[in-house]
């Protein structure tokens, strides 16, 4: 039964990872028609749902990679102490996974903050446009005020820099923890075989 559990986990992880291979441009037309049919065209809720849907594969990939590095002994000892699944998950696993949560949050924030294609296609009114779209329409039809455009660009970039600097430690540790754990596993396997 343990083999089936592992195969099921691998299947669902691969299923969500396939979302990383699908380009967003290939889904623009169906998304546009779906948003109109659902009454979500030109709404921030519709745009947020699209960002969440396209951000899930990356988030699941980062989080599942990190969860695999957490020693099972921690969870098993919590179960032996009488802790249930949800208590173990919320009090042990989530605090350990803070670097991965920070990494996923920063990655998805940066993607959503700088996204242009969906915002241009799925919004029409000025009140629902994102900052990259506002920058795109910042220039007038016959003249361009480059000084104002560059100032607006700097103002749009500043929040991304602040978020990255604030969570830089978590991003670096979240990205490197999985690689360190995997390399330790590969190093320890030959020594086990030699014994």
Task: Tell what function each PLM region has.
Residues 1, 5-181:
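A structural signal for multi-pass alpha-helical bundles of membrane permease subunits
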Residues 2-4, 186-192:
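Short, small-residue-biased leader/transition segments that mark boundaries at the very start
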């Amino acid at each position: 039964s343990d083999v089936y559990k592992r195969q099921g986990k691998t299947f669902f992880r691969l299923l969500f990872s396939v979302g990383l291979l699908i380009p967003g441009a290939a889904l623009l037309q169906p998304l546009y028609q779906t948003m109109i049919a659902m009454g979500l065209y030109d709404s921030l809720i519709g745009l947020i749902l699209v960002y969440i849907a396209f951000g899930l594969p990356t988030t699941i990939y980062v989080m599942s990679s990190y969860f695999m590095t957490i020693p099972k002994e921690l969870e098993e000892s919590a179960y032996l102490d009488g802790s249930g699944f949800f208590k173990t998950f919320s009090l042990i696993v989530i605090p350990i996974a803070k670097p991965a949560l920070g990494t996923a949050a920063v990655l998805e924030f940066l993607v959503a903050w700088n996204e242009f294609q969906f915002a241009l296609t799925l919004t029409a009114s000025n009140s629902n446009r994102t900052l990259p779209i506002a920058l795109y329409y910042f220039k007038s039809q016959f003249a361009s005020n480059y000084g104002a455009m560059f100032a607006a660009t700097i103002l749009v970039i500043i929040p991304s820099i602040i978020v990255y600097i604030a969570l830089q430690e978590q991003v670096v540790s979240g990205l490197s923890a999985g690689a360190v754990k995997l390399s330790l596993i590969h190093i320890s396997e030959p020594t086990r075989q030699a014994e």
